[in-house]
């Protein structure tokens, strides 16, 4: 059965190009088009597509408002097209908070030309998101006001989706099928959360979290549960363009009780602080003078993921053998699997998100299938269990 897609853009040229690229894949059928957000909401209810591609800036109703309405009326996985600017990044993060599942950069030159890589990326995202035939993961709304830097304490602070006056967001959402390289349906049953390996107090020096599709919302839910006095440093690897990571680090910092910022080369990894790897480059850890620091370096041409979870995990295995917790959250592909194997050989624990709460069960499925996962946890429990570490 083909994945049924609805294409939404106020530009007729872009609608035609996106439709053409999608329908070159035998597994995708474009069942409708819309020129603005209002039409998108109507078409989503009428056509009930498996996935929607959505522009942000449109007349009558913008893409963010349309996503919000679609999630209220006819929850459907939505792939946003985003400009590669700081403002575009913040708008895209707002769309993800509203319920969109993922985003893809919107470059006129790429879409107007016959860019094979862009076409393949678009097709893969639509197939992955549309394959679940259901609703996307719960949104993680922004707080009413930024966290006061001087008030980061053990005071109670609601996690995203649990803010005052809002009902908690259900942790489960539409699970989309992973792309071809990963076959989680054949994966052996992973250990139940309550039977997984427990971590002794003082046994760790570092937490490394890796994620891709669905990661921005997942990270907001996980990181917002960590207390201000969290005893470990956190390195976050999120597949994201370079222009997006500064805005995303700011968003996390607004939500969290610990400090979150974009990593710079040579930054010390300190307890109670999370560093987000910059997009478009590689990030790892190294030890200088007995202190763990971040190493930021250019990616080689053969490295597809920039930043790469595998590279970060491998560096943690080298400099924190047996003392780095690797966490793999929702995402396409298998990035993190090989690095998790290296971590595991040093005696380090590995956690992964479960299938039911993953937007794309690719990366977590890969580590589960490889047999290196110690604990398989629902998304909200990942943050809860991290908060218990001492």
UniProtKB/Swiss-Prot annotation:
Class of this enzyme: hydrolase
Biological process (GO), any one: chemotaxis
Residue numbers spanned by region Disordered: 130-198
Post-translational modification note: Phosphorylated by CheA. Phosphorylation of the N-terminal regulatory domain activates the methylesterase activity.
SUPFAM superfamilies reported for this sequence: CheY-like, Methylesterase CheB, C-terminal domain
GO molecular function annotations of the record: phosphorelay response regulator activity; protein-glutamate methylesterase activity; protein-glutamine glutaminase activity
Enzyme Commission number(s) from the entry: 3.1.1.61, 3.5.1.44
One Pfam family this sequence matches: Response_reg
Protein name as catalogued: Protein-glutamate methylesterase/protein-glutamine glutaminase
